[in-house]
Amino acid sequence: MEILIANPTGLCFGVKRAIATLERELSRTKAVYSLGSPIHNPQEIERLSKLGLIVVDSPNEVPYGAVSFVRAHGITPAAYQALRERSPLIVDGTCPFVKTAQERAKTLSQEGYVVVISGDVEHPEVQGIMGYAEGDVIVISSEDEIPARLNGQRCGILSQTTQKVASFASLVGKFVSISPEIKVYNTICKATLARQDSVCHLASKVDGMIVLGGRNSANTRKLAEIAADAGVSAVWIEHAGELDRGWLENRRKIGIAAGGSTPDWLIKDLIEKLNMM
């Protein structure tokens, strides 16, 4: 069995930066409180928790005087202010690409546009971006969800950084026909684009694809969807222990693609297990 690895794959710049920033602070501080999971990979969060990371759901759970951490997905301005009232030090791990999307949302709303975000309204990154819009803001996952009230409105459109390019392009195309004026910012990050392209390319060369990453990772889910759309048999697993030996039978070439929040050590574990089978 031949194993081919998507290139690029695994940790993106923003997640690497967040982990490195968090690790530096953990080396100096016994406990660091993160508002929400710093990244979407349960195994890596477990490792960081052993170093002193504490994940909380609300600023009110952060003890007064404790060090706080802003996750890679970012948070709303209101949440940041709530942390500031409790923490003398806030370590900001927000991905720079997410920061750009936040700034675009703020600018568009100040210019009088209805801010339209292409993405998942339940995702923390999207919720954070929404907080920067000072006026009307709506999140749409597909063109079928566009409400009638937006017909004839000036709309400013941007994207969740991990959105599929095709989904974003389709949504923009629809707004061209219903809005008298649109302003578009493609805020899909370059790392996402590169990983999506690498999966498309690799899927045509293998007879099975393994997509590795957290179940709560939006970018990993998109990679799994792209692999399946390419027509290759694909499985999505969080770690090597979930790999089904039966799925591997009679497969001669296996492709591996890892989400942008999947650390190298998990990829290495998977390759080692495949080589032992």
What would you call each of these model-derived segments?
Residues 1-277:
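The feature marks the mature, well-folded catalytic cores of soluble enzymes
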